[in-house]
């Protein structure tokens, strides 16, 4: 089997270019993310696909579709135009955050579900399961804290003359907004446990990083909900866009870090699934009584 390491290095370089473009709010190359995932797919094919052979290409295809869909627009095309902003309705759009969460998490969730469903069953490693259970509790707990914090802020600061939305509508919108990210986090942790049970520790580390990506995605989904000002200014948003103070030179540090961690997760997953083979898969069993 030919070495695919140059493809993996090129994919990593494109991932760095993509994250750098997000960091400075000016794409280095608008095709960087698409090419990074395409090179990962080529690396998987060259290095040898695991069984079942369709799983890794199917997962990467979902990621490629999302990367093409969200590819930055060409700044040199399209005329400039005025945009007129009008005040919207006072009520909170209940589904705005949920739709934003699906947009952010659907491709990663599909990839994780495909790899989890296609992976062969192996024994559970109790220490790994225990760590994953703690991590899952943290993901769910963070989502609950965010919802409760918004609820308390909206309830404490609501004024009759504010003309804002009802507290129940606000809490419902935020509760729906966190669901896609929580689902991604739990699925990624389940995938990490399954891969660890197969002895694929590198790929398992990639799945853990994918679960970490769910946290800023959760805050971004809440940020898409048009909350009243008094409900939006809460201190529990540890992974929101302003968690790292932006600057003129680096206006988007949190989105850039999120993209870097996400693409690193994909690199580790693909490298761990298609790279090293387990000894039980690579070598035939020795006859009984024979010496190695």
Task: Identify the residue ranges that each predicted region occupies.
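Membrane interfacial helix motifs at helix-loop boundaries and amphipathic/re-entrant anchors
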Residues: 17-36, 68-103, 141-180, 217-261
